[in-house]
Amino acid sequence: MPVSGQLASKDTSAQKNTIALLGTYHFNNPNQDQFNVNSDDVLSAKRQKEIAQVTATLAAYKPSHIALEFNANDTAMDARYQRYLKGQHTLNNSELEQIGFRLAKMLGHPHVYPVDAPSIQLDFNPGELAGEYGYLLEQLGKTGDSIMTQINDRMKKYTIGQILANLNAPAMDKLNVELYYKYLLPIGKSDNQPGPEAVTRWYKRNLLVLHHIMKLAEGKNNQRILVIFGQGHTAMLKQFLSYVSDFRVVNIQQFLPAN
């Protein structure tokens, strides 16, 4: 019997590898990004209770691998996790350890998996462009600062679970990626294009991250990968993964606490 004029295909969704992307702010205030959240003390009793709740709800995803924002070629992260398993390391205040290590131990994982690529530095000084393109850089600064202010305000009122749920909303992903197209991509002329070059380098880093993530499931089926990364990365990774049919992306919000 014909099926709407289309060839019927076998449903392989059950064999697909699954990815959940948890976009975070940096709990430990490393100030390594252009725009940074002023995180409060995640080691306080209140925040520790909230982190435990986030970890418990994330456990329902049942990840087979936990991928973290740490250089993929550096063994220090997993070595630290091994010490943590042996009771020889106290969790620091980064989201990688507070959520990543804690969850991995809860689930009995023998390893955690760093998948980041080295940050690719720009070869131009934004200050040099202040004259002709100052209006774009000014708008970028104002927009970025406004986003950080909103997150900082939410931090005073909401739990970590609620903050993460907001960060991982589609509207936040769109706002994040839009910054690159709206304020950086237009910068430059035919013989000098620092804006497109900056966007290209950001894309390259995130494509390398995706490469490392994909390697975790290479040649396997039914893997369930949880990626814990800065929200600026996960917004772009979701975009890339929409074109990778071998992976099914699940909405992380269903695995975050409701309050």
Spans of model-derived segments:
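Bacterial Sec-dependent N-terminal signal peptides
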Residues: 1-14
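Solvent-exposed loop/turn segments at secondary-structure junctions
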Residues: 26-28, 72-75, 118-122, 231-234
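Acidic/histidine-rich helix-loop elements
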Residues: 26-47
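N-terminal post-signal-peptidase region of extra-cytosolic proteins
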Residues: 43-55, 85
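Post-signal peptide N-terminal segment of secreted/secretory-pathway proteins
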Residues: 51-60, 73-81
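Proline-aspartate-enriched helix->loop->beta-strand connector
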Residues: 62-68
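Hydrophobic, often amphipathic alpha-helical segments used for membrane interaction and targeting
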Residues: 80-217
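A cross-kingdom marker for long, charged
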Residues: 199-259
